């Protein structure tokens, strides 16, 4: 089972709820306690901590996609929304969150666990 955002990153869940409510997006704010973390972005950029709350599509999200840029005190938070549901939380330039996201999803870019010791070739 995928972890709840609220359990895995409670401070991020609180921040999202607060920012969404302050911006008048109460319908989206009510989704935050129920968001499950499916995966992280695998782009490899050292400033990216993006999280998927639905499986990443093969290609574009499609015609019912929207995005919402929030105004956090640091970094960037951008929500990808499909059919009025949060499907991705783009988290950029937030090293505090990146470290924790990498701990939650430590696989390499191919989605395989790295060996704990010894040979690290895949």
Question: Where are these predicted regions, by residue range?
Answer:
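N-terminal domain-onset segments
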Residues: 1-66, 101-122
